[in-house]
Amino acid sequence: MSAKWEKLEGNQGVLTVEVDAEKVNEGLDEAFKKVVKKVQIPGFRKGKIPRSLFEKRFGVESLYADALDILLPEAYAKAVEETGIEPVDRPEIDVEQMEKGKSLIFTAKVTVKPEVTLGEYKGLEVEKLDDTVTDEDVEQELKRLQERHAELVVKEEGTVENGDTVVIDFEGFVDGEAFEGGKAENYSLVIGSGTFIPGFEEQLIGMAAGEEKDIEVTFPEEYHAEQLAGKPAVFKIKLHEIKTKQLPALDDEFAKDVDEEVETLDALKEKIKERLTKEKKEEAEAALRDAVVQKATENAQMDIPEVMVKNETDRMIREFEQRLQMQGLNLDLYYQFSGQDEAALREQMKEEAEKRVRVTLTLEAIVKAENIDVTEEEVEKELQEMASLYNLSVDKLKELLGTLDGLKEDLKMRKAIDFLVENSKVVA
């Protein structure tokens, strides 16, 4: 077999492949074995027709399509490997010659990864985030814990304030008519949460328990229910109860309730400081890694094929759909509630998808430029850590992964980022 690569404009080119006649005949043999099982000729059992009779009756050309299905994938894969190109999309194949006893000749128009011209990527000057934990940070975390452990108590006197929880009945009307989904009884609503459309929660402020009121609002133009979008509405409200948060005292008892491993408030503060210090250091390290990658990517030049952005967008949508499914939702429900469609979601994700592609291509170029590789020991260590994380044996994990190529590429990328960090100039 022979293969020749001809570069065209942009990121496209043509692969011309010739497969030996002997291999073509083998493909025709395999095709015959497959096709003959489905053919019935009087006087012969199904699948037992002589090859010569089959070709006389149906012509050898009737085997070409199946033979090509057998020959093309293998020949294309070998040609890609032989020429060293990196396709990013399915090829457009054109068969120029397919005949028994002759070689198979076909061309494949292919979009390949772009050439990346690296700019400055060593000695990049980046700022490191301050990872100091202050007493104020600890106090803010204590306040968050205090809020989390607050109790809702009925407000016996007074009126609704921002942050209160109210229990209400409501029914909405548009043009004097009630609408689906616009009615509820004993509904708990946190004022200021933004749960309802703009203007609704604000008009409950100042109401007293037992009071009834009509409030006027307008549905947003982009509201998910098209029949309500942009329309004025009136909601009849009956306020049953007002609840307010009662914060626990910040003392030793509070500390024990929050964390059974501590006995005093001071011990809780110390533990909070240790945790925040660890988190801030990790955040600063992650920000540093992001910064060097971003600068190296900005300094690199490349012409990204649109198909790579499309493929990355597809992957991002699949990831998003998986996250929705974990919440008991799906894309159709998301489109319904958000007022978006697939085209709008794709457009929203396109910029991030292109950024991800640029980062990946830049890191791949650095891996190549610096001859970065991974050892079997590094791969094995990563497998053990992953197996421990997912509570699997290493053998089972390998079985699920199938191939380790993807894992090795991820490790190379990680080492490329390590290289950028190690060779950067960090300023405070």
Curated annotation (Swiss-Prot):
EC number(s) reported in the record:
5.2.1.8
User: What is this enzyme's catalytic activity, as reactions?
Assistant: [protein]-peptidylproline (omega=180) = [protein]-peptidylproline (omega=0)
**Gene Ontology MF term list:** peptidyl-prolyl cis-trans isomerase activity; protein folding chaperone; ribosome binding
Q: Which cellular component terms (GO) are annotated to the entry?
A: cytoplasm
User: In which compartments does the protein localize?
Assistant: Cytoplasm
Tell me which domain of life the UniProt entry assigns to the organism this sequence originates from.
Answer: Bacteria
Question: Which BP terms from GO are recorded?
Answer: 'de novo' cotranslational protein folding; cell division; chaperone-mediated protein folding; protein transport; protein unfolding
Mind telling me which InterPro entries this protein's record contains? PPIase_dom_sf, PPIase_FKBP_dom, Trig_fac, Trigger_fac_C, Trigger_fac_C_sf, Trigger_fac_ribosome-bd_bac, Trigger_fac_ribosome-bd_sf, Trigger_fact/SurA_dom_sf
Tell me, in one coarse class, where this protein mainly resides.
Answer: cytoplasm
Query: Which key words tag this protein in UniProt?
Result: Cell cycle, Cell division, Chaperone, Cytoplasm, Isomerase, Rotamase
Q: What class of enzyme is it?
A: isomerase
Q: Where is the PPIase FKBP-type domain?
A: 163-248
Q: According to its UniProt entry, what is the function of this protein? A: Involved in protein export. Acts as a chaperone by maintaining the newly synthesized protein in an open conformation. Functions as a peptidyl-prolyl cis-trans isomerase.
Q: What is known of its domains?
A: Consists of 3 domains; the N-terminus binds the ribosome, the middle domain has PPIase activity, while the C-terminus has intrinsic chaperone activity on its own.
Q: Which family does it belong to?
A: Belongs to the FKBP-type PPIase family. Tig subfamily.
- The molecule here is called Trigger factor
Q: Which organism is it from?
A: Anoxybacillus flavithermus (strain DSM 21510 / WK1)
